[in-house]
Regions:
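Conserved pre-motif C helix in the palm subdomain of viral-like polymerases
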Residues: 101-139, 233
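Hydrophobic, well-ordered secondary-structure segments
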Residues: 151-191
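Non-catalytic, polymerase-adjacent accessory regions of viral genome-replication enzymes
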Residues: 1-97, 101
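Conserved polymerase palm-domain catalytic core
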Residues: 176-233
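Short, flexible loop/turn elements at secondary-structure junctions
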Residues: 82, 112-114, 195-200
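Short linear interaction motifs
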Residues: 84-87, 95-105, 168-184
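Short acidic, glycine/Ser/Thr-rich loop/turn "cap" segments at secondary-structure junctions
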Residues: 98-110, 141-152, 156, 194
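Short, glycine/acidic-rich hinge or "gate" loops at secondary-structure transitions
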Residues: 132-165, 227
């Protein structure tokens, strides 16, 4: 029999989703969707999350939920970079008839239920994959205290990821400290930085590669008695 996910996991996931969006200034659309998700319901939010959990655990209801989420998915594009004016150094208050966008920033537009399931995935599967990531990789790392070490269950803390600014400072300071160490040894040092531009728009993870990651993390998709999370993948 497939192991089911308890409704409290969905409640924790929603709390973490709200916290993550609150601190992310780029997620204005999702922030507004969450407000509507809480307001446009006759039931209390706990009852709504319990209902979502029931839909997830019931195979027949889950198929309808999956279709609902898939139909809700679209892409929102916002200007990231504009083409610069051809008259550098000249400031005028005349409005141009058209602004040319050089690059867009894309965001997934999806129903709140889909985002909640995404956080449930992070709490039950994603954190195991995160443990396999190179320790000096700092971007979007899952909180080390996301899972209680004693109970092996997600904590009720609202935080999901390590704060990016702290991760960035660690990346920067570690590199500079290493360079100073060699300078004190009278060695020459050169610091190079590289940026993989628009990485998330171009990366293509195949199903085989993803299955290999799950295997490396000790997640057996075929063992439903121990892993009732197959649906999340």
């Amino acid at each position: 029999m497939e192991k089911q996910i308890e409704d409290r996991i969905f409640k924790i996931a929603f709390k973490k989703l709200k916290s993550s969006v609150y601190y992310d200034k780029t997620q204005l659309i999702l922030r507004n969707d969450i407000v509507r998700y809480e307001q446009n319901s006759k039931d209390k939010i706990d009852s709504k999350l319990e209902s979502l959990c029931t839909q997830f655990n019931d195979d027949n209801k889950f198929e309808k939920l999956k279709e609902l989420i898939k139909r809700s998915i679209s892409i929102s594009a916002f200007p990231k970079k504009l083409i610069k004016s051809q008259t550098p150094g000249v400031i005028i208050n005349k409005q141009t008839s058209q602004t040319t966008v050089n690059q867009n920033q894309y965001f997934i537009d999806m129903c709140v239920e889909g985002h909640i399931l995404g956080v449930v995935w992070l709490m039950t599967i994603g954190y195991k994959l995160d443990k396999l990531v190179y320790e000096k990789s700092y971007g979007n790392r899952i909180r080390k205290k996301l899972i209680n070490e004693l109970s092996d269950e997600p904590t009720f803390s609202p935080y999901l990821f390590e704060p990016y600014f702290m991760q960035y400072e660690s990346w920067r300071d570690t590199a500079l400290d290493e360079a100073k160490k060699y300078l004190h040894q009278k060695n020459d040092v050169m610091i190079l930085t590289m940026d993989l531009k628009r990485y998330f728009y171009s990366v293509d993870v195949t199903q085989n590669a993803f299955d290999k990651m799950l295997e490396d993390a000790g997640i057996d998709k075929s063992d439903k008695a121990k892993c009732g999370l197959v649906k999340l993948n």
